[in-house]
């Protein structure tokens, strides 16, 4: 699958109104479906006297809608059966034997959950205003998302009862969407992909105008799947999902050329391989600077918005906050894509067979790097970076492996220390080397190696223990190259100081001729509005 992203910010366009209406109605539809499920859950278990007014109203709509839907389903079934009986023949007899009547079951105390088909029938038969004013299938997709969240909640609860240590806490009921808009979803029946005059367009349902999404060559040979309109910090982000018929590359059984990646803070990515090339670091100072500026500016804006109000319940939304968040996400996204393409090109040049990326399952919850480092580390979306690297590497035919990086920074890769998995309650093993100071690791022989390079090599060894077998490892500590993100951008051009500009010879001649011509006109016709003459003042 391939997803193409387009940002849309033209508020004067007809598409802005269309996207706003559909995303707002999607939020209302999802909250309405959630409201019906929650009130059915609580109201069906109570007696009629104990139910609240909302529970009574919801249950009335539920039972009325199911009753009408069953009556219409029975009428359709009987009419089809009558047509098949009249037609006669062997074919109609076979179809008649396979004909099944649709019956919606009423909720009970034990089976109270309303699935997608039941909710759709209830809203349709009761003529719910939100359901009726929305475009076809967009409202149904909103109901599907709500039901899917409830199904995920039930599955999580079953797993939580069996193995609660897998979770950080007890799963909670699906809540309501607090924002004003939610992501709307169009299938290929309600948003068609068309081509005209070398351009690609999306034709949305109930809209005459076509939305241009780029050149025709960008979409030829791809199968269109769906379109999502996502509210994005005061704008809209259009996500077009396409099937590029590409399969995820198979993982080799015994790879010879492996690349290990250790994500970090000061060094955004540390890359080391087992094929004799010097490791390199992609510096993370730019990402830290972006986050630092974002956090400071955001704190000032929120302080100005909540001044004089309770900060925990006040409204924290403004155009400045939207623009600040949007610029930060766009900047990080651009840097992550550049890092990913740099890594993949490096891997293709050196014929890498597999890339191993380290990760910590609970790095956001249980990190302990100090107050300042914790704030910087938690605000960097490392999972998004890993997914971008995976997507681009798979597109180029290089498989990606995620490896738990516990104890990779403590074990010595030069001494071939075993790298175990972390288990709560177990005593950690003793390792040959240790970290002497910031950024350096000393092995048992006294050799100093970059600490992040040592971690990247151990990530490879943890996945493939024999990756460095029979190889000299001196290339890991002899030279460590550094890559700065700033080098991937064009240099800043200073503005020319216009005050230092001197006229050329031709300009002076041209202006001189003009002044002489104006003087001749003044002699011939006298003073005019277009000719300046000094005002004589009395002595």
Q: Which role does the model predict for each range below?
A:
Residues 4-10, 209-215, 280-282:
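Generic detection of short hydrophobic beta-strand segments and adjacent strand-loop junctions
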Residues 26, 142-150, 321-328:
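Short amphipathic alpha-helical coiled-coil/interface segments
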Residues 234-539:
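Positively charged, helix-rich recognition surfaces that bind polyanionic ligands
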Residues 1-135, 306-318, 437, 476-477, ...:
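Long, compositionally biased intrinsically disordered regions
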